[in-house]
């Protein structure tokens, strides 16, 4: 248990108790209940803080072991990422708020991916390993994007062939064949 649950020794003034016995008892009960309530709150706070610290340590340990690459130089990379984020903010300074936030975030993310390529790949692998739903969604988007690119290539090929046929027909008409 905690030291908050120790009994409290209160020396009541005998004169006060003889004049107002109910008041002295109420004061003693109030002090004891407040003392115990604060002890309970303190104990719960200690437990919550301990849980928070253990979760933080576990998260940092996982990040060090699985995400961060040890052979990338951190200080210059972080400086470049910060400058990239500020540059994105400068580029978007006269835009509306959502566009400003989006451009700044994209600029920061792109700079991070450029300055920390191994860590970026590790983050992607970590997210896909820990969150299979995100991996599934990413694969679905990738398949749809590839299908759209193939459809666009087919459309462009047929459009180019159509333009070439019209060009050849126009040349034949001009030559009089």
UniProtKB/Swiss-Prot annotation:
Any one GO BP annotation for this protein: cristae formation
Q: Which InterPro entries does its entry note?
A: MIC26/MIC27 (IPR019166), Mic26_fungi (IPR033181)
Q: Which domain of life is it from?
A: Eukaryota
Please give the GO cellular component terms listed in this UniProt entry: MICOS complex; mitochondrial crista junction
Name-wise, this protein is Uncharacterized protein C1442.05c
Task: Please tell me the species this chain comes from.
Answer: Schizosaccharomyces pombe (strain 972 / ATCC 24843) (Fission yeast)
